[in-house]
Amino acid sequence: MNENVIALDGPAGSGKSTVARQIAERIGFNYLDTGAFYRALTLYLFRLHGNSPNTESFADWVKTSEAERSLSDIRILCEFSAGKENRIFLNGEEVSLAIRTPEITREIKHIAKRRIYRNFVNQELHSLAKLHKLIIDGRDIGTEVFPDAKFKFYLTASSKVRAERRFLQLQEQGIEADRDEIEKEIILRDKSDMEREIAPLYQANDAILIDTDILSKNSVISKILKILDR
């Protein structure tokens, strides 16, 4: 059993990152957003595709040997900050905001469903878990990445509630967005995450389900802290 990792899984916008950050701060763990690693990887490949003299779509290009070989050139670093989002660096460049744009959100599904890219990210996560006590949020932390985590939680919420949360988050970052479009993208993302062949999104048998539609943020945090104190 891995006591260095607390796993929080669930669909996009279910409140995982907000809850995970605050719990990490209270119990002395580091919060790690796995989605940021996939976003940074997507950003790198998206830029590389844009500079490549090819006519393939991004979805097709990421399947090529050219794209896969580029993994050896990627360095993703995470700077922990108590109570705040991780600062993410891609080959020395801070990309904490660049990885959160709607454009990257739309393209990330092409990366997340390919085993070679998942293996790349998972190796990074396991390396960090050897050095730090982590509370990690993602889609498959308790089912695929750390199935031996001592504590596993699965957070969920309706697509409408999740879209509103994402809209407000983008507003705070100065990024223009449309609520309806965000909800459409969330629904499509859910479908893609749940139906993909590799590491689909689902609740682990031993994970505790928490519906954040009907609980306030503080209630969710209190509930998880009580379970961790058992």
UniProtKB/Swiss-Prot annotation:
Localisation per UniProt entry = Cytoplasm
- In Swiss-Prot or TrEMBL terms, this protein is called Cytidylate kinase
| Family membership | Belongs to the cytidylate kinase family. Type 1 subfamily.
EC number(s) recorded for this UniProt protein: 2.7.4.25
What are the recorded Gene Ontology BP terms? nucleobase-containing small molecule interconversion; pyrimidine nucleotide metabolic process
Q: Mind naming one GO cellular-component term on file for this protein?
A: cytosol
Q: Give the source's domain of life in one word.
A: Bacteria
InterPro entries according to UniProt = Cytidylate_kin (IPR003136), Cytidylate_kinase_dom (IPR011994), P-loop_NTPase (IPR027417)
Q: What species is this protein from?
A: Leptospira borgpetersenii serovar Hardjo-bovis (strain L550)
Give GO terms: molecular function aspect only. Answer: ATP binding; CMP kinase activity; dCMP kinase activity
**For binding ATP, which residues are annotated in this chain's numbering?**
10-18
Catalyzed reactions: CMP + ATP = CDP + ADP; dCMP + ATP = dCDP + ADP
* Keywords for the protein's UniProt record, in alphabetical order: ATP-binding, Cytoplasm, Kinase, Nucleotide-binding, Transferase
Coiled-coil annotation: which residues?
none
Using the UniProt record, name the top-level EC class of this enzyme in a single word. transferase
